[in-house]
Amino acid sequence: MENGEIEGAADDGVPVPAPPNGRRYRPVGSSDRAVIQMTSMEPGSSSSTAVAAVSGITPQPPRNLTVDPSMQEDHTVSQGDSKLELFGFDSLVNILGLKSMTGEQIQAPSSPRDGEDVAITIGRPKETGPKFGTMMGVFVPCLQNILGIIYYIRFTWIVGMAGVWQSLVLVSFCGACTFLTGISLSAIATNGAMKGGGPYYLIGRALGPEVGVSIGLCFFLGNAVAGSMYVLGAVETFLDAVPSAGFFKESVTVVNNTLVNGTATASTATISTPSLHDLQVYGVIVTILLCFIVFGGVKIINKVAPAFLIPVLFSLLCIYLGVFIAPRHNAPKGITGLSITTFKDNWGSEYQRTNNAGVPDPNGSIYWDFNALVGLFFPAVTGIMAGSNRSASLKDTQRSIPIGTLSATLTTTAMYLFSVLLFGALATREELLTDRLLTATVAWPAPAVIYIGIILSTLGAALQSLTGAPRLLAAIANDDILPVLNYFKVSEGAEPHSATLFTAFICICCVVIGNLDLITPTITMFFLLCYAGVNLSCFLLDLLDAPSWRPRWKFHHWSLSLVGALLCVVIMFLISWSFTVVSLALASLIYYYVSLKGKAGDWGDGFKSAYFQLALRSLRSLGANQVHPKNWYPIPLIFCRPWGKLPENVPCHPKLADFANCMKKKGRGMSIFVSIIDGDYHELAEDAKTACRQLDTYIEYKRCEGVAEIIVAPSMSEGFRSIVQTMGLGNLKPNIIVMRYPEIWRRENLIQIPSTFVSIINDCIIANKAVVIVKGLDEWPNEYQRQYGTIDLYWIVRDGGLMLLLSQLLLTKETFESCKIQVFCIAEEDTDAEELKADVKKFLYDLRMHAEVIVVTMKSWEPHMESSSSGAPQDDSQEAYTSAQRRISTYLSEMKETAQREGHPLMEDGKQVVVNEQKIEKFLYTMFKLNSTILRYSRMAAVVLVSLPPPPLNHPAYFYMEYMDLLVENVPRMLIVRGYRRDVVTFFT
């Protein structure tokens, strides 16, 4: 079809049939949003007049596309009105382009390998709820998640334990990690549209499904466990504020050593602490109540969320006001107000033992140091993913996520550093360590304000965790990578109730543990693992710098991402090497499980780009020079269906892949499986795609490392000639052509096979490709059929050692490892057999090959019949020889009669041939003698390898086929081998 023709109807309404070949095009319509509507190409034209001129034609949807009827407009541009009629229009390209732009990555069929049935519903993404800007969409959620329970009930304790200067180092260290992660997150998030799943989506699309799922599940666990941490923090604060609400009472005796007038004195004090059982009971109740809110859906959560944000900001204001006006008249003695003396006393660290509640105790079971404090404090800087988790609700993700995330990170880090200085100068170390809610004690106007603020802020953070974690799990399940997660799948817009129940179960289990200081290191590991994944993703994408890597956030560099990833790993080991090993082992187990059981997925991840660039670099490093024999690998091109006698649903002979595996040492190497379809490419393109998919499935089923290619050509000879010239790149071109011997040609009366067979062999010789023809492929053993006996080589001509190498490769397989190699040297009558045998033995010894050498002397050619002295083998060969003579004589007579009748020289398949009857008899007799020798010595061999004679020039292909038939007659399993003009083995180390 020409570009101007329309698939649909002409101006007069008469349908225009689409031609059988070629793409189907229609003119550009006004409803086609992917192209520019040109409205001013003529004087006086305008968009209004152009639209008014629209009439008549409703374009038909292309094949394999399901078009949403609601999106089909009633008006399109007719053929005569189209200004871009010359260019034509491919609706498939347009639809795929539109879907790609809206974030639905649909692969456009462009080759037989890409061909899939595409079902597309045309339509714009539905608007889902209000959109938020940078402040409310990213900055505030990040701030709310970062400022959590750790700041209120543990930060003053950390300052008292680590001292001012180590607390500053601690905050800077953890803040640098999250800031660098925020830079990496900003770069990835601004490189395209984001879907649900937050960091899982980013990591999975950058590092692949396996890494994405493994880190995503760990991040899900981190969020679920973080919910329990927030619940415990809220309950602990409530019990501290209202001790009478506890069902169980627990007190701790604190021993303080002081120095008075040079004499050490010890003072004891008894303080009440929340009971573990109270934490468990209230924690489970609060978790269940929060789950009821989560089950109410996003609308209820969005209405409740502001109530948890305002108390956070108000409580911070009250804390700072209280710090600056301290001490008040009723303040404890330990609160000195902002004092330089107190600041100096608290400058250094004073690590000591505490009980499970964090109260100093010389006999306590927990000893704190800087590494342990990193694990305790790091959750106070997490929460930077809150904005990316809400990408679907943002007006402009590529602007809001970088600005909002990094602003929240810098704001909280600056606030933490400022708070270290304030708290270090506010109270004595004893007060910092024993008053678990010092922030409430100093707050203005009353501690109750802080208690309420802490409880509401932590419950809000817990609500966010219980809301985000199920959606993360549902996003992983919806990607359909891990079948075991199918239970958590949800339809678009539905609430993930199953995932919410599972998250609540994990949260309740952690609440039952009841120890906040033991839970936080676990959360830290999972969050650090996720942050390391984000940094590694940006590092890989930045380093590869693929054409698709064009983030709008320009302030990034691969070195910053690498430093961020290393910081994450260092912090993990600083906290606890045992927790680190466990978390990495868990992620590795999930990775292995996904790679083993997960479904295949290609998200265009960075690893694929890395493999591509590595392959290009390796290919360039190989150069165009010949590979040294020490580095030579067989790259077989497997000719799958050369003679066309397999069922249509069988893409390749079942034993060809078994034989291809036998040509590789320990599976190293690559095979190229090729099949040729006779016909016109435009007509058979879809058939080629289907055949390619079937062949790919066959290769995967046979566990053979190889690729499938389907070629459509007018004839098998032309198709093979194209393959042998163009297949492969540089030194990765196939060097061995493997195909089945056409045993069926005479039985099926396929008279075209001889000429095709000869043409293929001649093409291989001209292209300098080795040839391996397998006779008896139906009887070729699989990997479970062990063979015994010998592998016999009939070494007639020098082939660069290919035949010897093939025999050694066969021995490396379990099927043939029990066999021994015998080398038969075919010598003329006047050759010194013993000298030849010694030379061959020395040659094999230098090649590190173990084989028995046998010299067979054949009499010079004499056109006479010999009597058999060895019984059946000679009789079998004799019968085949006589039959071949008779068929050749008949065929030659017919050729002569045809040439005489039509008055032209001897012709075969339209080509002139030269017939020398004496040479024909000589060639035939040589094959007879060789076949007789093979049957005499190697009838029971596991495999026989023999040299392939090249087709004589201008010789009838039918005669050559008769020679080959006589050679392989009655030999059950044979490899006919022809090397090429180079060595594949070497003496040297």
From Swiss-Prot:
Known tissue expression: Expressed in roots, stems and leaves with higher expression in root and leaf tips.
Ranges that cross the membrane: 133-153, 168-188, 215-235, 281-301, 305-325, 366-386, 406-426, 442-462, 499-519, 523-543, 552-572, 579-599
Induction entry: By KCl in roots and leaves.
Miscellaneous comment in the UniProt entry for this protein: Plants silencing CCC1 have slightly shorter roots and leaves than wild-type, and are more sensitive to KCl treatment during seed germination and plant development.
GO CC terms of this entry: membrane
PANTHER family hit by this protein: CATION-CHLORIDE COTRANSPORTER 1, SOLUTE CARRIER FAMILY 12, CATION COTRANSPORTERS
Keywords, in A-Z order: Glycoprotein, Ion transport, Membrane, Potassium, Potassium transport, Symport, Transmembrane, Transmembrane helix, Transport
One GO MF term: potassium:chloride symporter activity
Subcellular localization(s) per the UniProt record: Membrane
Protein name according to UniProt: Cation-chloride cotransporter 1
NCBIfam families cross-referenced by the UniProt entry: 2a30
Residue stretches of biased makeup (Acidic residues): 1-10
Residue numbers on the Cytoplasmic membrane side: 1-132, 189-214, 302-304, 387-405, 463-498, 544-551, 600-989
Role: Probable cation/chloride cotransporter that may mediate potassium-chloride cotransport. Involved in plant development and K(+) and Cl(-) homeostasis. May not be involved in sodium-chloride cotransport.
Membrane topology type: Multi-pass membrane protein
Positions of region (Disordered): 1-29
The keyword Chaperone belongs to this UniProt entry's keyword annotation: no
Gene: CCC1
